[in-house]
Amino acid sequence: MGRGAGREYSPAATTAENGGGKKKQKEKELDELKKEVAMDDHKLSLDELGRKYQVDLSKGLTNQRAQDILARDGPNALTPPPTTPEWVKFCRQLFGGFSILLWIGAILCFLAFGIQAAMEDEPSNDNLYLGVVLAAVVIVTGCFSYYQEAKSSKIMDSFKNMVPQQALVVREGEKMQINAEEVVVGDLVEVKGGDRVPADLRIISSHGCKVDNSSLTGESEPQTRSPEFTHENPLETRNICFFSTNCVEGTARGIVIATGDRTVMGRIATLASGLEVGRTPIAMEIEHFIQLITGVAVFLGVSFFVLSLILGYSWLEAVIFLIGIIVANVPEGLLATVTVCLTLTAKRMARKNCLVKNLEAVETLGSTSTICSDKTGTLTQNRMTVAHMWFDNQIHEADTTEDQSGATFDKRSPTWTALSRIAGLCNRAVFKAGQENISVSKRDTAGDASESALLKCIELSCGSVRKMRDRNPKVAEIPFNSTNKYQLSIHEREDSPQSHVLVMKGAPERILDRCSSILVQGKEIPLDKEMQDAFQNAYLELGGLGERVLGFCQLNLPSAKFPRGFKFDTDELNFPTEKLCFVGLMSMIDPPRAAVPDAVGKCRSAGIKVIMVTGDHPITAKAIAKGVGIISEGNETVEDIAARLNIPVSQVNPREAKACVVHGSDLKDMTSEQLDEILKNHTEIVFARTSPQQKLIIVEGCQRQGAIVAVTGDGVNDSPALKKADIGIAMGIAGSDVSKQAADMILLDDNFASIVTGVEEGRLIFDNLKKSIAYTLTSNIPEITPFLLFIIANIPLPLGTVTILCIDLGTDMVPAISLAYEAAESDIMKRQPRNPQTDKLVNERLISMAYGQIGMIQALGGFFTYFVILAENGFLPSRLLGIRLDWDDRSMNDLEDSYGQEWTYEQRKVVEFTCHTAFFASIVVVQWADLIICKTRRNSVFQQGMKNKILIFGLLEETALAAFLSYCPGMGVALRMYPLKVTWWFCAFPYSLLIFIYDEVRKLILRRYPGGWVEKETYY
């Protein structure tokens, strides 16, 4: 990854070879990035390192040389991912998906108006109005959804940290603070506890340095860093520090071996931004829906075009009819309805701590069938907590809950007093200042995670650790190092004025080796074989729980030999460190969050497979997986079965094990077929010790199985997987910027349980969108049939274009949106995730219900009203057939009705427009029933109840609007709507009732005979 690595990725070299095959090149680069990190700097000796980078290991680079390298390599910063320009985003909203249908409609309208204007003397302006309205609808809705997304991305931008990072470099022998962006390859850099590592470093000297690699590898434990080469894999060796990880304690010096995009972190970020993102399921649904609607529209249009030519219309009139029918089929209000429904759900999710970045992701979460979750910080609290102690030869359980409501143990034993004193004194962690009023478990600490856990545990059970330290002042200490694996300090004893106590903690087996006695019930007894076995059992048991175990021992130094003021020498040890007294063990774990087990259970009953993918140890990963229920009670892995039957693992049939823990190093050597085999045959899977590249491979594996995959994660290492998944979920509090950019949704409270709420909302909106669409499409039939009869039977036009718009954009809007607030019919979280291949948003059954059944009854209601009004005015239905040409003839002012009365053109038109208004009112009346039956797809409306207040408001609103349009003075001029006799409103009532009864009977049959032909034909 050093100087030579820059050339591996030079795109220029590859493009020349494939003759500009951009796509191939991109795939090649992605495969490059998917490979594990390749570098050899960690294997070089210090002299070789100095030669390779032409740098003096004590004085650093010269200023001039640093300038040259900076000019050559560019600044040490990650290239920001290519963002979509705002105007492109806006155009996507304006011309994407559903809007295209409306645009085509608008263009056809202008076309028809153009034809009419050219051919007729006094063309009607209907088509012009219609075109303008359609265009306006698209533009307004487009602006609305653009505004919604812009709002989410505003919140996103506020996450970015604006503080420029500083780095401490040595150049020409002088230490200097520079901006981290100016660090170059070969620079000599110093880091200390609390710093962010400014670039990839090869360590050349260190003092107790530990780094937190969790954002890169997912290990929650701080890792020691020292100059020794300890591992072939650069990610595991101790002598490399990675860009943007944090140094937790100690100090180190290192040589920069890679900067910016060439760092390990940079490669992962590049990998994430280079991934092709698939379309969201809802986008595909809407596309499928548009194809269906367009199919119906074109079929109707063309068949009536041919029919009108046969009936002897001129081809021009036939074209106008064709356009009219296609436009009448376009549900103008639906685009707005879908957008508003998704927005409402997004807002509801934001209140429940899920921030959705793009509206379409709302539904994706509902169709999720696999969740790949990160462990650290998502399933767990991301803070080490003391879980168990072993003293007086028994294991005691500590309280690991978030709100301190869990187990307590007997604190009266003198051994516990001794153990808590060692844990408090032999400990360098401290609480940061000014947090007195915050609960202990929530306080920030300075120091190593394990020590902080001990500090909090002792503070909670024994009171102030600071006072304990003040009463027992420290006189000497040896900090923890990796060779002797212990930490030791000597304190003046508060309980005897002359003497000192030596306290020590460290790796349990190392501590036990230094002890000759053990403290039981406050008395020292010799450490015999029996006690050693007891220790061994306790150590194995706690280790097997995936916990990190520390041993504690002490020695009361005799005051005769070591009086107060004695100079302890920690280099030439002038005090005993053997024959100590063993006191006990304490073990720590990063405990699961309180709400997670419940959430995992809900996922399981919802048919969602939860897979844990973590960089942590297999044992810890398995322990947490069992703790949160990802591996459920009684399910065994191959290893468990082998241990139970006492046979080697190779003899167990892997198919017998439901659960499975896969190690990253095994995953590395697997073919995709083997991975598919694992994903297929095991229901409960944990991947441990995985690298970021492997996360990506796992996600792709799940997608090959046809799953819709959600991935949660917070580290930079999760970003490629977040981007590749169908929906990426990042953590709002602990998440890194890179992961938030790659994600589609952000959990503001970092809680896995919020995902379950998201799934529920996503499933609900899918159901409710179906209902909304069914409701909206139904009124299409009573809008189209008048036009068809006008062509075939030559009757006066029963319903005008303007009135159609009043229905689609006026009365139908609020009721359609109100269905988004409808409560779930059954327990949504008990059914399997929908299959995107078979379970579509709009299917043939929905179309047949809306168009073929309910829509037809509605049309009958409208025509009934139309014929009643004309008959009351003297035109009986028999007289109307074939009257159209005379009726629309301006020069004909003496048209006779069935009773011989003569009608002028103006009088006829008033009656015609009154009919339009009445037809419109009838549609409103039958849409009442349609709205109520659309509340449920299977249950009876009486089971569901009328709890949806918005829906009741919608019913009242559409009625009030219809009445207003009919009776408001001046409407006759503006929209050609005329006042109606009260009785005419009631003509459609029987049809409304018929719709309600028809559908209730249908749903009754559905419930009585599940899977019968009624369900096959009508259950949408």
UniProtKB/Swiss-Prot annotation:
This is Sodium/potassium-transporting ATPase subunit alpha-2. It comes from Bos taurus. It is found in: Membrane; Cell membrane. The sodium/potassium-transporting ATPase is composed of a catalytic alpha subunit, an auxiliary non-catalytic beta subunit and an additional regulatory subunit. Interacts with regulatory subunit FXYD1. Signal peptide: none annotated. Its EC number is 7.2.2.13. It comes from the Eukaryota. The modification Phosphoserine is found at S10, S439, S450, S496, S559, S587, S672, S826, S940. Keywords: ATP-binding, Cell membrane, Ion transport, Magnesium, Membrane, Metal-binding, Nucleotide-binding, Phosphoprotein, Potassium, Potassium transport, Sodium, Sodium transport, Sodium/potassium transport, Translocase, Transmembrane, Transmembrane helix, Transport. Residues 6-85, 151-286, 337-769, 821-840, 936-948, 1004-1020 are cytoplasmic. Belongs to the cation transport ATPase (P-type) (TC 3.A.3) family. Type IIC subfamily. Mg(2+) binds at D714, D718. Residues 1-5 form a propeptide. Residues 212-227 have a biased composition (Polar residues). SMART domains: Cation_ATPase_N. It is a multi-pass membrane protein. Residues 107-129, 307-318, 790-799, 864-915, 968-982 are extracellular.
